[in-house]
Amino acid sequence: LILPVYNEKDTIEYFINQFLLFFNQTIDQIKYSYELIFINDGSTDQTAEILTQVFHQYEHINVLHFSRNFGKENALFAGLDNAIGDIIIPIDVDLQDPLHVISAMLNKYEEGYDVVLAKRVNRNKDSYLKKKSAELFYNFYNKIAEVKLEPNVGDFRLMDRKVVDEILNLQENQLFMKGLF
């Protein structure tokens, strides 16, 4: 899993606990090992200290620290560049995307899909402002861009290693993850 974080000191350990609970409950169905790659995007709170602590505490956790905030896209690409697994899944640590969806994504992968997008069907927990800004963003973007974005599809997706390798081979220096699919 690729986990970009910025000032997430309050959510990191909770995410790890929830992920381990999910993994241990579904280990019989999930035939894969895992790695958690946290990318600290220049956090100004205690995120760096917490990540250093969990790095030493857990075997399957790797941590990258940016010297300043470079933005989520750069954090995602740093995570892709450092991932060693055959399946890569970016996800936010705030758990707005439910972990159980990973099982469904893995099922699609086993059916032969190289990329599996997760789409939010329920935004009831989002504030009015969040819902409205997301709606405006997708409407505006899709009016001006050649490649359309599927509304309510974020960075939570499964990508096969060969897809990630092709992304990493792109010569662009301003990649927009959602715009690639």
Residue ranges and their predicted role:
Residues 27, 34-37, 48-82, 119:
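Conserved donor nucleotide-binding strand/loop of the catalytic core
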Residues 8-11, 43, 98:
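Donor nucleotide-sugar binding loop of glycosyltransferases
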Residues 1-3, 12, 19, 34-39:
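Hydrophobic targeting segments
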Residues 88:
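Short aromatic/hydrophobic "clamp" motif used to bind/position activated sugar donors
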Residues 37-49, 95-96:
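A conserved acidic beta->alpha catalytic loop
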Residues 64-68, 72-82, 99-180:
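Acceptor/aglycone-binding surface of glycosyltransferases and processive sugar-polymer synthases
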Residues 8-27:
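Short, well-formed alpha-helical segments that are part of the catalytic scaffolds
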Residues 66, 91-93:
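Catalytic metal- and UDP-sugar-binding loop of GT-A-like glycosyltransferases, i.e.
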